[in-house]
Amino acid sequence: MTGEDERIEMEIRKRNGKSVPFQQEKIFNAMKKAFDGQGREIGSRELNEILAAVLDNLAAAAPLTVERVQDEVERTLMERGHYEVAKAYILYREKRSALRRVRHTIARTVGDDSLDEVLRRIQMDFTEEVYSLAALQMKFESFCRPGMTEDERAEALTKAAVELTTAEAPKWEFIAARLLNHSFRCRNAQEWEGRGIGDLYGRLRYLTDKGLYGDYILAHYTHEEIAMAEGFLCPERDELFTYSGLDLLLKRYVIQSRSRVPLETPQEMFLGIALHLAMNEGSDRMGWVKRFYDMLSCMEVTMATPTMSNARKPYHQLSSCFVDTVPDSLDGIYRSLDNFAKVSKFGGGMGMYFGKVRAAGSTIRGFQGAAGGVIRWIRLVNDTAVAVDQLGMRQGAVAVYLDAWHRDLPEFLQLRTNNGDDRMKAHDVFPAVCYPDLFWRLAEENIDAPWHLMCPHEILTVKGYALEDYWGTEWEKRYLDCVNDPRIEKRSVTVKDIVRLVLRSAVETGTPFAFNRDSVNRMNPNSHTGMIYCSNLCTEIAQNMAPIEHISTEVHTENGDTVVVTATRPGEFVVCNLASLSLGNLPVEDEAYMERTVETAIRALDNVIDLNFYPLEYARLTNQKYRSIGLGVSGYHHMLAKRGIRWESEEHLAFTDAVFEHINYAAVKADAALAREKGRYALFEGSDWQTGAYFEKRGYTSEKWRALAETVAVQGMRNAYLLAVAPTSSTSILSGTSAGIDPIMKKFFLEEKKGSMLPRVAPELSMDTWWYYKAAHLIDQSWSVRAAGLRQRHIDQAQSMNLYITNDYSMRQVLRLYLEAWRVGVKTIYYVRSKALEVEDCESCSS
């Protein structure tokens, strides 16, 4: 009679007054727990006999209530001599009664009866004493003031849960998220009820009519398909959010009215993104909608911030970052400034290569000393970043790159420092230096060796070639040729002089970023069609580049009007389409699961290319030619801590090597399959993918890899570039995991935001993970560098890798980290984060 035999059909009136079918198995289970709690064994037969006696006595009771049932259980237990069990059952009832009282008190104080069910679920899911709602009630009541509205009281309740979050009680951030979500959903439901709109199709129609949703969604999907998609929604996945993640999402990511009222739920946001990304899929389109929705809503994959924010909207600029090669001409420089302004207008970040621009004191049309140098132009870039501020939301973001042999380098390295002539400063740009192998080799072997800085325009004029167009041994040969040519003016310093300027700036400002140009180009899978001069704003992108070239300006007459037509050669204007695998939320050891997840993410990124709104035609042309994407990771430290792997250990190095090799394998496999289905990228022939050099350079010699190389040679690749690890500062907060490949800053800290203190807790912090979350500034950075070197073999582009130093680091120690990174093949270094230094996170590349 455990609930299946001799079932009695009755109804029971709950405490809220509602009548529901009586479930006798609940009594059976409650009594079983009471016996188990006393350490008393009881057979199913005897327990069924007690249950039968209870049911016999209840049969005559009408109406049946919860209290009547529980009273009868107590009486029957005592009649049969089970006094200790009955006592435990009574105490259990009293405890449950106390839990109900605190729930009811909180709900009554807020003025929201529907809150009771949310609080009941919280009590069920967070059973430790440290998460008692009595503590929440006390904190909440301390915030309550006479005259507060219901919304203000609900906000105070959420604030109380936020403030209870500590390193010892980290799960309060999940409780706070549930309370915030409940308040939001109540307001959201009222918004739509007030408009008389109930279903998803109606909401999308309203948002489309108001110009808040792209009309292309309803143009591509039928009413029936939208209804099917609504069935995919899983509101319970909102419980995966931390307070910080949900608060950020509601403020920055969901669609809002023009009066800043959120009009879609988190799950509707994920579904809207999925609908957009699957829009052009074929017969199994709704299947891909569900797969995209599931990977996003389960927080296993995050798309880049522009994709999360702008997919499904009228202006759907989905790309994170752009990279431009600045030409050495007035028209070219101002075109690049214009390009940056347009990119920034739509929320993109920018990388700009200034290595072709002539140095200060160089000639212009034969006039000696006429050129002002790169600093003047970079100051214009700085002012453009400040001026084009995305409707007042935030200013533009740009990294400016210069080669280590450029004659303006010393001034460039002081752009952001606090000393010197302020007319030569640009505090709102992020400088980065492109280093050849020769520079690091000399820094390692003979730091006092001479280093010659030259003007790229003079080299081109005298030698007939652009030195920056070469890399590796060919670059070294031509560099020495220029050094030995007396016709070229040199600014001769020592390697030590440059190193000192670099390190001083890095420690003081966190920049310049480092770009190891020979390491990048040596491993470039598309070196057959060009070269890579620099990276992007966050140093994870490494793709072929070429400047936009002016061809002609002609005057025409069209329909009686005089028009001026300017023709340009589009060059290669790099675009970054990013997403990240949330390693802390994924079963990385499950190869089949990871392959399916990577396949889904690769397909979503490939679709971004065709569904994107491009701020520039140059970007669209390059993106369609190479179809480059950048799948990265977040939650790296989270992944290690969950598995009990210490950062400073050989186990860490072996684990990351295996994980990233399989991610790369899954990505290449998925991309080749996509090429078979949809076609290969235009420049596949002659690439390292096609020749097999990609696999040889990385030492992929196993049978599995050889078979994949053969498949790639036959089927091709859909995308020219695949993997790039971005910093993920914002989207890692959304998914409740650690940022990018970085170690955590602290296990727990308070962050000030708009006058209040927000708790930040390491993901899944517990006694099991506590000792594996070593703070970034306490970690021996050589372990981070070695891990980055192992990962780099499996990443065809680059990684946003930071170095964390303290005031105890000497300049020599910092230099050793740079040298070690170069030796192990790390392509780029992002910030040098000194413990006393606050640096800005990149929003655009957050994926």
Walk through the language-model features, giving the residues of each.
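Alpha-helix capping and helix-loop boundary segments enriched in small/acidic/polar residues
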Residues: 18-22, 42-45, 110, 261-264, ...
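Internal maturation/activation junctions in enzymes
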Residues: 295, 313, 337, 597-620, ...
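Conserved, charged catalytic cores of large soluble enzymes
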Residues: 189-283, 366-380, 392-396, 401-536, ...
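Terminal amphipathic helices with adjacent charged low-complexity linkers/tails
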Residues: 88-95, 102, 172-204, 435, ...
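Catalytic alpha/beta core of large soluble enzyme barrels
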Residues: 222-230, 234, 238-247, 539-543, ...
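Function-dense linear segments that define catalytic or interfacial modules
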Residues: 255, 261, 270-285, 289, ...
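Short, surface-exposed, low-complexity cationic segments
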Residues: 23-41, 115-129, 271-278, 739-744
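Core nucleic-acid recognition elements
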Residues: 2-8, 18, 44-271, 287-293
